[in-house]
UniProtKB/Swiss-Prot annotation:
It comes from Mus musculus (Mouse). It is an enzyme of class 3 (hydrolase). The modification Phosphoserine is found at S82, S162, S199, S200, S335, S339, S372, S441, S542, S543, S545. The keyword Phosphoprotein applies. The modification Asymmetric dimethylarginine is found at R395. This is mRNA-decapping enzyme 1A. The gene is Dcp1a. Residues 152-161 have a biased composition (Basic and acidic residues). Residues 193-229 have a biased composition (Polar residues). Forms a complex with EDC3, DCP2, DDX6 and EDC4/HEDLS, within this complex directly interacts with EDC3. Part of a cytoplasmic complex containing proteins involved in mRNA decay, including XRN1 and LSM1. Interacts with DCP1B. Interacts with DCP2. Interacts with DDX17 in an RNA-independent manner. Interacts with PNRC2. Interacts with SMAD4. Interacts with UPF1. Interacts with ZC3HAV1. Interacts with ZFP36L1. Interacts with NBDY. Interacts with DHX34; the interaction is RNA-independent.
Amino acid sequence: MALSCSTVRPRRRGSALRSKMELLSRAEQEMSLAALKQHDPYITSIADLTGQVALYTFCPKANQWEKTDIEGTLFVYRRSASPYHGFTIVNRLNMHNLVEPVNKDLEFQLHEPFLLYRNASLSIYSIWFYDKNDCHRIAKLMADVVEEETRRSQQAARDKQSPSQANGCSDQRPIDILEMLSRAKDEYERNQMGGSNISSPGLQPSTQLSNLGSTETLEETPSGSQDKSAPSGHKHLTVEELFGTSLPKEQPTAMGLESEDTDKLLGDASQKEPSSFLPFPFEQSGGAPQSENLGIHSAAHHTVQPEVSTPVLITPASIAQSGDKHPPSYTLPLSPVLSPTLPAEAPTTQVPHLPRNSTMIQAVKTTPRQKSPLLNQPVPELSHSSLVASQSPFRAPVSLANPAGTALPSVDLLQKLRLTPQHDQIQAQPLGKGTMAPSFSSAAGQLATPESFIEPSSKTAAARAAVSASLSNMVLAPTLQSMQQNQDPEVFSQPKVLPSAIPIAGSPLVPATTTAVSSVLLSPSVFQQTVPRAADLERKASSPSPLTVGTAESQRKPSIILSKSQLQDTLIHLIKNDSSFLSTLHAVYLQVLTKNKDNHNL
């Protein structure tokens, strides 16, 4: 009995020592855990530790190992956030510790007493262990942790590709705004394609082709309804893919891709990783620019595309075919700039090689098939004076494009617009340029060109003299008559000049010597200047003034306000060449002097 009692007492002492050591080790672990949490608050527990390790690094240039200044205790810990595992070496030599997260990209190799590993940045390190048992234990733990992280990443990838619940919603997964926008975009495109299938049957092949992506997605996902798994193929949209293209599901038809090629592209895209998966893989493989989404297709692709109800721009090939046809006959002649029958004047020649996105050249090519804006309306029925104007060398449209379809100018305006050399009616022109209407054929109307405004220098003096002589009865005769009636010395003061009443850019009805087109295009300034003049003529005709002298022809003409230089030239010419004018002027001068003398005497 004594022997048995002596053998029991040491056992009790050993168990008490082990429990005491466990309490001490637990307290040390708690202290170590608190110290680690100061550096990383997401650490939850310590998985394993070893007392003495040293870190070596491999130098590829020297092809040898180099010892670092990191040496101390190794801790393997667990974290509550990603990455969920890691290890650190608490350095005893300095304040720089080694912290390495453990993920699926970490590779370990055991070479006793060293544990080699390579991280994601392709740096190679070696951990030397003082105890070989610790080296084997830590190596086995690291292998288990890497395997666990690999399974975790694969599960996260599967959860990202397909919903984790039956109703298509996952509470653990965060809400993705791009995924919500892509689902709304897919639903909108399905509604648009459904409406277009009813309106135009030509879009049915492209609709079937665009639905291949959703069909292959259904084959890879688990069993479920079509509505649950259809949006899963478009979860990895980017902002550029979502807002950068317009109607991308109609791309296969515009680019001329076959259905087999599209199936192959979609099959390759479905086997890739989720990060490289593209919802629209055929956009990059076609090699066509994004400008084809706007309807600017090439001529070769234009023949492959089926009939679509949406409007597209006319290609150069279609314009070349339509240009061979005869131009339609119109009641009014076209402008020479827009007329297809004048190849020398029309700058719309066919260019053999055009850029694909040159919309401006294509727009210019379509202009020969349009009417001139000024000749768009039919000529209204006018009175007898308009019939006479149609026989004159200047035929100008007098009607504007108004909703009522009536002619705005009156008959007097029509008479003012036409120019008849038989009655010697001269319109108001700037005397500084001295431009006169040259002789022209009376067979057809002429079109005013820039060359008609250039007058030879030899005709300038004669034209100026003729105009000043003809204007003397119109302007100076009423002035002299008013001086004789009023006997006012202020008559000789300089008259007010209104530069806006005299056209500076030349008369709008100057003819040219061309016989290509039998119509005259008028600028908008003609209607702005002639309408108030016609109103002044009607007002003057209704109220005759006793101050007007001369013939009946001069009474019908409006008074023209001359500038200082024009008045000076006219007066000098009349004083030198007209003796009656000089006599009348001298008589008025004597009367004014007599009146001033009488007023001074009174």
